[in-house]
Structures are given as C-alpha cells and as structure tokens.
UniProtKB/Swiss-Prot annotation:
Lineage top rank: taxon: Eukaryota
Organism encoding this protein: Aspergillus fumigatus (strain CBS 144.89 / FGSC A1163 / CEA10) (Neosartorya fumigata)
Gene3D superfamilies, sorted: 5' to 3' exonuclease, C-terminal subdomain, 5'-nuclease
Protein family per UniProt: Belongs to the XPG/RAD2 endonuclease family. FEN1 subfamily.
E.C. number(s) listed in UniProt: 3.1.-.-
Gene name for this UniProt entry: fen1
Subcellular location: Nucleus, Nucleolus; Nucleus, Nucleoplasm; Mitochondrion
UniProt modification remark: Phosphorylated. Phosphorylation upon DNA damage induces relocalization to the nuclear plasma.
Region (Interaction with PCNA): 341-349
Enzyme class: hydrolase
Protein name (Swiss-Prot/TrEMBL): Flap endonuclease 1
Keyword Phosphoprotein included in the entry's annotation: yes
GO MF entries: 5'-3' exonuclease activity; 5'-flap endonuclease activity; DNA binding; magnesium ion binding
Length: 395
C-alpha cells in the first residue's frame, strides 16, 4: 500500500522534489528495485483477455514475462538493475497483511460470482483484486534473473528499506518502487514507474528526499510522523484525517506525540484515535528497520553474461515462450550490459551542499508561497460566501 496521498502532498508543497523524465535519462545508472512490488505489478498488468498468461501445463507465466521483458527494457536503456526481495514482514505489519488477505478472499468470491452473472468489466476488476505474490512466483523470478545474469539479494524484512540502504551508501543511484514509504526509509532518490511497460507511456518519476524535506519545511522525523498520519502499512489511519489535515497537524504541533495529545484533549472530539495505535513502534520501524549494511557480504552483487541455453530451456521448453524472442533477448542482454559499464560524467563530480544562506532563502521562499496560498484560499472562500449571500437575480 505504501503511504496514502504522499505523492500528492509532495507535488503540491515541494514540487521541486519531483522530476519526470524518460527512461533514457538513467543511462549508466545502477538501480535497486523492489522485486515483490514489481512482480505484483506484472501479475496484474501482463494479461491476455483479462486472465493471467499461462503455460500449456496451466502454470501462471505473467510474472516471468513481465520480469524478462521489463528487465530487458531497462538494460536496453543502459540501466543496471539489482532486484531486492522481501524477507519476513515486521510483526507490526501483520494486521495490515491480515486485512489484505481478507480483501483477497472477498475479491475471489466476488470474482466467481461475476463470472456467473456479471459483465466482462466486473470479471476483470475482481480478477485483479485476487492477485497475490507467492513463494513460487518469487523462486521462479530468482531463477530467471540468475539465468539472465541479473543480480538479486534477499532483504531481512522490507525490500524498500534495503534498497534505501544501498542508495544511501552510493552502491546504486536510486531505489525503485511504487511504494512511497521507500522515502520513509531514507532513500535519497526514489524512482517510480521504472518497471512499467513502454505502452503505458508513463514518464519515470524521480523524487528527491532532501528537496521534499526542504519544501515541506520538516526534518526526517517529522516527515515520518506525517507519513504515519497519512496512513501506512503498519497502522490503520485516524478516521477523517486526510492529507491536508495531516499536514496541518504536523506543522502546527511538530510531532505525533503533541498531535495525539491535542486530539485527546480536544473537547469537540473532532478526531478519534484508534484504540490500538502504536505510532511510536511504527516510527521506530521506519527509523531503524531490520536491514543489512551496504558492506555486508550478502549485499555484494555483480552483473554477468546470460546463460543462453539454460534460459531457453527454462523459458521456452518449460514455460512455452517463443524461442526466437528469448534468444534475441539474451543477445541484447549480452550486448547492453557491456554498454552499461560506461560511466556517467556526473559520477566524477560530487554535488555541492547548499550553504546555510541558501537553505534560509529556500525556507523563506517556501513560507512566502504558503502565505500566498493561504491568502488566495481566504479570498476564494470570501468570494464564494458573498456570491451565496447575493439574492437571486441581483446584478
């Protein structure tokens, strides 16, 4: 699920933190990719007539088709992908996972009913909701990556957190995931839509954490508190607290402790905090996740030449893929992984840190922008009020 409405909040309050560009802009870069999120998106998106792709023996192959061709697309564009797989989820996440399982069960039942009585659109909608990534999907994707010569590692718990560690250490340029909570784990740069198909024509979103914090006027701890208020995988959200309210509460009170205190002491009882809401535990999971340090032996990785014949054996003979396409893909891998060894010019230079004066200037501009927005909203509200007060037919 990630963090609800976080992209919207950053887009509206820290637009300089987001860049949209073409996949070609990332030539020569190493990227750590959230594998489980990618596989889930492949299972949903790679379909034929509303159904997942199957081999002749009835095995699902959508995850392999997506992994093979989307990885090829990255390598064709000079990117060196590293996939990171989820480990065991933190205990605090078990409640959210239980809810997801229940929703899948409901969707499965609705899917069966739609097949009997519903429209094609209903069948497609509920079919997508039943999708879940299994151990078998993960194991087959790992086998495929090994044969392709693409490295992968297993995270102790959350893949996004491990991707963030590698990005902070400079072992990769960025972490790639659709989950915005990757920023909560302190990934300096988050790439979204990297594993989308070319047909979707979605630009790659590049989100810079330091610019987001500057634009929001927050430190990292406040940012995490904001994300918990917005709604994360570890806790159920506070009813009636949307993105604007969450942002206002953190800016006004500065921390979740003070937000909770203000809500509990509010005589109007406008918001009600859930009975079990261990926000401090959730914050701790974001601040100190269970990860391996970047210099750990299990975080060593390298790209190798594909094992062409073993790839053909697995994808063509076992899974029913087209042999010409698989061999063509293997040839592209061999050629383009060598090309991607070229260094980007930016790798020779270190970014210059902003001075205190520059930071103060940015904060001043941000505060001025906020004041302008507040003033505009007041004027709009006043104009609406005056328009309502006018009698009908009045000029």
């Amino acid at each position: 699920m990630g963090i609800k409405h976080l992209f919207q909040v950053i887009q509206e309050n820290a637009p300089d933190a987001i860049k949209a560009g073409d996949i070609k802009n990332h030539f020569g870069r190493k990227v750590a990719i959230d594998a489980s999120m990618s596989i889930y998106s492949f299972l949903i998106a790679v379909r034929s007539e509303g159904q997942q792709l199957m081999s002749e023996s009835g095995e699902t192959t959508s995850h392999l088709m997506g992994m093979f061709y989307r990885t090829l697309r990255m390598v064709d564009n000079g990117i060196k992908p590293l996939y990171v797989f989820d480990g065991a989820p933190p205990k605090l996440k078990s409640g959210e996972l239980a809810k997801r399982t229940a929703r899948k069960a409901e969707a499965t039942e609705a899917h069966e009913e739609a097949k009997e009585t519903g429209t094609a659109e209903d069948v497609e909608k509920f079919s997508r909701r039943t999708v879940r990534v299994t151990r078998e999907h993960n194991a087959e994707c790992k086998k495929l990556l090994k044969l392709m010569g693409i490295p992968y590692i297993d995270a102790p718990t959350e893949a996004e957190a491990q991707c963030a560690v590698l990005a902070r250490a400079g072992k990769v340029y960025a972490a790639a995931s659709e989950d915005m909570d990757t920023l909560c784990f302190e990934a300096p740069i988050l790439l979204r839509h990297l594993t989308f198909s070319e047909q979707r024509k979605e630009p790659i979103q590049e989100i810079h954490l330091n610019r987001a914090l500057e634009g929001l006027g927050m430190d990292r701890k406040q940012f995490i508190d904001l994300c918990i208020l917005l709604g994360c995988d570890y806790l159920e959200p506070i009813p009636k607290v949307g993105p604007n309210t969450a942002l206002k509460l953190i800016r006004e009170h500065g921390s979740l402790e003070k937000v909770v205190e203000a809500i509990e002491n509010d005589p109007k009882k406008k918001y009600v905090i859930p009975e079990y809401w261990p926000y401090q535990d959730a914050r701790e999971l974001f601040l100190h996740p269970d990860v391996r340090e970047a210099d750990h032996p299990e975080c060593d990785f390298k790209w190798e030449a594909p094992d062409v014949e073993a790839l053909v054996e697995f994808l063509v003979k076992d899974k029913g893929f087209n042999e010409d396409r698989v061999r063509n893909g293997a040839a592209r891998l061999q050629k383009n992984l060598k090309t991607a060894q070229q260094s980007r010019l930016e790798g020779f230079f270190k970014p210059v840190a902003r001075t205190d004066e520059e930071k103060a200037s940015l904060k001043r501009k941000h505060d001025e922008k906020l004041q302008e927005q507040k003033k505009r909203k007041k004027e709009e509200a006043k104009a609406k009020k005056e328009a309502k007060a006018k009698p009908r037919g009045a000029a």
